[in-house]
Amino acid sequence: MTDLIPLEQAHCLPRKGSDHKLGEARLAELLPQVPGWELAEAGMALTRTFRFADYYHTLAFVNALAWIAHREDHHPDLGVHYDRVVVRYSTHDVGGLSENDFICAAKTARLYDQGITA
């Protein structure tokens, strides 16, 4: 689906059932497209830690990320700390990772890279 356009420009689609769970080959194709992200939990989740100067910038990022999650209707698990946010994506309805996780990971990284919260 997202091979024709960059992940950060794609939009999430409803995904339910194990048919949409990504296999190892597809994970290996998509992971290089989201630098800095790591597979976690035996390939069941995608995680990355984002660092900030202070709590204000941390929360500004979280609020901007909440807008992306709402727009895409795909919501990460967040660990919010004073100077960092741990973002974890997984698609519960497929029992692992779907393309939606990689789309949102790319959008999250773009938000951070643009320095919107700086």
Swiss-Prot record:
Chain coiled-coil ranges: none
NCBIfam families, A to Z: PRK00823.1-4
SUPFAM superfamilies: PCD-like
InterPro entries in alphabetical order: PCD_sf (IPR036428), Pterin_deHydtase (IPR001533)
GO MF terms held by the record: 4-alpha-hydroxytetrahydrobiopterin dehydratase activity
Family: Belongs to the pterin-4-alpha-carbinolamine dehydratase family.
Domain of life: Bacteria
Keyword Zinc: no
HAMAP family the record matches: Pterin_4_alpha
Catalytic activity: (4aS,6R)-4a-hydroxy-L-erythro-5,6,7,8-tetrahydrobiopterin = (6R)-L-erythro-6,7-dihydrobiopterin + H2O
Gene Ontology terms describing biological process: tetrahydrobiopterin biosynthetic process
Protein name: Putative pterin-4-alpha-carbinolamine dehydratase
EC numbers, comma separated: 4.2.1.96
Keyword Transferase: no
Keyword terms: Lyase
Top EC group: lyase
